């Protein structure tokens, strides 16, 4: 579904990202310009609702009765899965690339006027967004997901890892 992502992992993470951008823009930064995101957010929410309510989902769910966890348990277990997969997703190559990027990031950030005031909040938000990647599979299947799902979660993790590297470097300057 174009308006809400192609599967529940990306749809859920996309929705949370869009809501976060809207919140930061309007509430935190007090910018009325952020309200231009409201129509897109509403379309996304409607699309996500249609995606969740699609008839094929209930048909498919009948094949997996008793496999998944409750919604709250799925959310809690998502954080455990997130911690469990950190070593697998953070290999030596990823760490080497992060170290190699440090001088470039540091230099680029010298020219910005943006103030990086909330590194802890960004780190916490990042982990929560990353963990949401496990929630749909835990809810429907009772495990972290198939390899294609884990690949999508890993990509999210890597993007957020580098976002945090940039943000923390900005905060340290």
Language model segments and positions:
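Transmembrane alpha-helical segments
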Residues: 1-2, 16-23, 98-105, 157-172
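Transmembrane catalytic cores of multi-pass membrane glycosyltransferases
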Residues: 5-16, 23-149
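Intrinsically disordered, polar/acidic, low-complexity terminal segments
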Residues: 33, 172-173
């Amino acid at each position: 579904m174009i308006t809400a992502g192609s599967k529940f992992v990306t749809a859920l993470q996309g929705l949370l990202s869009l809501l976060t951008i809207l919140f930061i823009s309007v509430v935190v930064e007090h910018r009325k310009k952020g309200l231009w995101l409201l129509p897109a957010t509403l379309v996304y929410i409607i699309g996500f609702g249609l995606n969740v309510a699609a008839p094929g989902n209930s048909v498919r769910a009948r094949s997996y009765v008793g496999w998944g966890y409750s919604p709250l348990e799925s959310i809690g277990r998502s954080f455990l899965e997130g911690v469990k997969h950190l070593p697998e997703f953070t290999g030596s190559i990823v760490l080497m690339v992060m170290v190699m990027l440090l001088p470039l990031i540091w230099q680029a950030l010298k020219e910005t006027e943006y103030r990086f005031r909330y590194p802890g909040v960004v780190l916490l938000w990042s982990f929560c967004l990353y963990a949401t990647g496990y929630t749909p599979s835990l809810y429907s299947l009772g495990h972290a997901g198939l390899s294609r799902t884990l690949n999508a979660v890993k990509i999210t993790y890597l993007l957020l890892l580098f976002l945090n590297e940039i943000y923390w470097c900005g905060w340290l300057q």
